[in-house]
Regions:
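N-terminal Rossmann-fold cofactor-binding loop
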Residues: 45-55, 69-70
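C-terminal amphipathic/interface module of NAD(P)-dependent oxidoreductases
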Residues: 2-6, 256-299
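NAD(P)H-binding glycine-rich loop region in Rossmannoid oxidoreductase-like domains
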Residues: 67-110
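NAD(P)-dependent short-chain dehydrogenase/reductase
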Residues: 154, 166-208, 214-215, 222
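N-terminal Rossmann NAD(P)H-binding glycine-rich loop of SDR-like oxidoreductase domains
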Residues: 15-38
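Mid/C-terminal beta-alpha module of Rossmann-like enzyme folds, strongest
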Residues: 217-275
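Conserved Rossmann-fold NAD(P)-dependent oxidoreductase catalytic core, especially the SDR/UDP-sugar
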Residues: 113-152
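Glycine-rich NAD(P)-binding loop of the Rossmann-fold in SDR/ketoreductase-type enzymes
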Residues: 71, 102-117, 151, 159-162
Length: 299
């Protein structure tokens, strides 16, 4: 698979408008906060309802656009017309841990159709789309998956996410996995772990290679946006780590005194080979202790 020449572009506009879709989710909230702290960027986040705004700091509430229904084309067009984005980061997606991910009437419109609709709108608006996909498009039977490996997930969630992976001249799909804290739930690994009081199991044969949300936001800013020629699908990953070892690092970084019992019963390896992305961009992920500390410090 040939690569385009690596041409890094300095964003010449004084301010780059970044529209963050799904800004109250785990990833979207981190992306919104990160770009709000980044010079030269003007982020605007979306939420379907204003009810969650009280969970955000005041400076972020002022950056939120509420009341837009992304499943309604007219509503999306109105959003684009109001924001005039240069970049759209799609952080919307039903996550695997909730029941709706198994409902085709909900999973297919959000996970499979919406990214393609966004790419079309971005094309009309002259904007660039950064879409976030997942390692769950794979069954997890072999690990170190490459972009050309067939997506072999058997569940609706994995299949719907695969259908939503966009490949257009103005769109990049980053296939990855994330950890981080959430605004109002404990679906994710870190929030769930920090909420536990008694002993927990740490799976020694469940392998993870994703990134903290703050690191993913940094990669988008520093490695994706300056490369307008980058398009299509790329794997983005850190070095593989077991869930047991990851929880040990999280416990140490957050000062969580809890027993983590090693458990080898769950065997799954969805680790991603991101050599293609690294060769194109020069990105080298930090070691896991550093990634976890950065996640803690970001909050």
């Amino acid at each position: 698979m040939s690569e385009p020449p690596d041409q890094v572009t300095t964003l010449t506009k004084n301010t780059t408008m970044v529209l963050v879709l799904g800004a109250t989710g785990m990833l979207g909230n981190a992306v919104l906060r990160f770009f709000a702290q980044s010079k030269g960027f003007e982020p605007v986040g979306t939420a379907r309802s204003a009810a969650v705004l009280s969970l955000l700091p005041r400076e972020l509430r002022e950056r939120m656009a509420c009341g837009f229904d992304v499943e309604n084309v007219d509503s999306l067009v109105r959003l684009f017309a109001e924001v005039h984005p240069d970049v759209v980061v799609n952080c919307i997606g039903l996550v695997k841990q909730i029941a709706e991910a198994d409902d085709p009437l909900q999973a297919i419109p959000i996970n499979a159709l919406l990214p393609h609709r966004l790419a079309r709108l971005c094309q009309v608006a002259g904007a660039r789309l950064v879409h976030i996909s997942t390692d769950c498009v794979f069954a997890g039977t072999k690990g170190m998956y490459r972009e050309e490996d067939p997506a072999d997930a058997q569940d609706l969630y994995g299949r719907s996410k695969h259908l939503g992976e966009v490949d257009y001249p103005n769109a990049v799909t980053l296939r990855t996995s994330i950890i981080g804290l959430e605004l109002a739930s404990t679906h994710g690994l870190v929030a769930w772990f920090l909420a536990q009081a008694g002993p927990v199991r740490g799976f020694t044969r469940a392998v993870f290679s994703g990134l903290p949300t703050v690191e993913l936001a940094r990669v988008i800013r520093d490695h994706v946006l300056p490369r307008p020629q980058m398009r299509g699908l790329y794997h983005l990953s850190a070095d593989p780590i077991s869930k047991y070892d990851l929880l040990q690092l999280v416990a140490k970084a957050y000062g969580k005194a809890i027993e983590i019992a090693p458990d080898d019963k769950l065997v799954v390896d969805r680790s991603l080979d991101s050599k293609r992305f690294r060769q194109l961009t020069g990105y080298s992920p930090p070691a896991w202790p550093e990634l976890v500390r950065a996640m803690r410090d970001f909050g």
